[in-house]
Amino acid sequence: MTAQNFMNVVRFKLKSDCVDKYFEVMDKTNFEGMTQRYIAQTGEKDYCFVGIWKNAEAFAAQRPAMIAHLDEVRGFMEELTPELGVTDPVSGIIVSKIGYHDR
């Protein structure tokens, strides 16, 4: 079986006065094994992070670095719920990928 691309998605909410600070940190952040990174603004203060990784092993290897990164930006985020805390993360193997180019 060949290595499959892997992705993680994290929903979060930024404090209004911390948006610029958050993106300053993100501009300097680079995780080894991550091939692409997207952040979508989904509401007034709501965001969704999508990371594309070479494979699940690359993602797992960066877990300590991702936790350290979250510790760095946690103060910029609002709690989503008491159960979730400040992030709502999911991850998994990419099972479908379609590229659309200038149709």
Regions found by a protein language model. Name each.
Residues 20, 55-67:
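Short amphipathic alpha-helices within nucleic acid-binding modules
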Residues 6, 16, 22-23, 47, ...:
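Low-complexity, intrinsically disordered short peptide segments enriched in small/polar/basic residues
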Residues 15-17, 45, 57:
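A short, structured loop/turn motif at beta-sheet edges
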Residues 4, 30-31, 56:
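Helix-centric, low-specificity signal for extended rod-like, repetitive segments
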Residues 11-38, 67-71:
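Short amphipathic alpha-helical segments
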Residues 52:
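Sensory beta-strand/linker motifs that couple input domains to effectors
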Residues 1-7, 11-13, 35-48, 72-103:
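Glycine-rich beta-strand-turn "strand-cap" elements at beta-sheet edges
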